[in-house]
């Protein structure tokens, strides 16, 4: 058994990523951000689903800024550059990638 809360820290300096599961078909991980913490620009090379478990985040891609709250679910567009910023003091989301 894995406990996410015991394996992450909320930092405004950098994203904290904790791998939950990896197989030849799935990569599943949790990302923790403190207030104003940033998951720097990157792309999702495969279909990916984001689920916010705690806090609020800004999800910025191209010229669009989205705001997600606890329990929001979002299908991340494949190949589109995006960046995520924490709004609350503690922000936690998971990403499931179909490999």
Please name every model-derived segment.
Residues 30, 49, 64-67:
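Short, surface-exposed secondary-structure edge patches
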Residues 63-78:
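Short acidic-glycine-tyrosine-enriched beta hairpin
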Residues 32-34, 45-58:
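Short, conserved beta-strand element in jelly-roll/cupin
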Residues 27-44, 78:
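Conserved short histidine dyad/triad with adjacent acidic residue
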Residues 24, 45, 61, 86-88:
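A generic beta-sheet turn/junction motif
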Residues 25-26, 35-36, 56, 99:
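Short, charged/polar surface micro-motifs in flexible loops or helix N-caps
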Residues 1-25, 60:
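A short, N-terminal "cap"/entry segment at the start of jelly-roll beta-barrel domains
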Residues 78-99:
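Ligand-binding loop in jelly-roll beta-barrel domains
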């Amino acid at each position: 058994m894995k406990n996410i809360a015991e394996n992450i820290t909320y930092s405004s300096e950098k994203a904290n990523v904790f791998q939950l599961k990896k197989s030849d078909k799935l990569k599943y991980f949790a990302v923790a951000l403190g207030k104003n913490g940033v998951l720097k620009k990157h792309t999702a090379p495969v279909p990916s689903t984001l689920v916010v478990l705690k806090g609020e985040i800004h999800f910025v891609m191209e010229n669009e800024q989205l705001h997600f709250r606890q329990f929001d679910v979002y299908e991340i567009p494949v190949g589109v550059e995006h960046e995520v910023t924490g709004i609350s003091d503690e922000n936690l989301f998971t990403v499931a990638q179909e490999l």
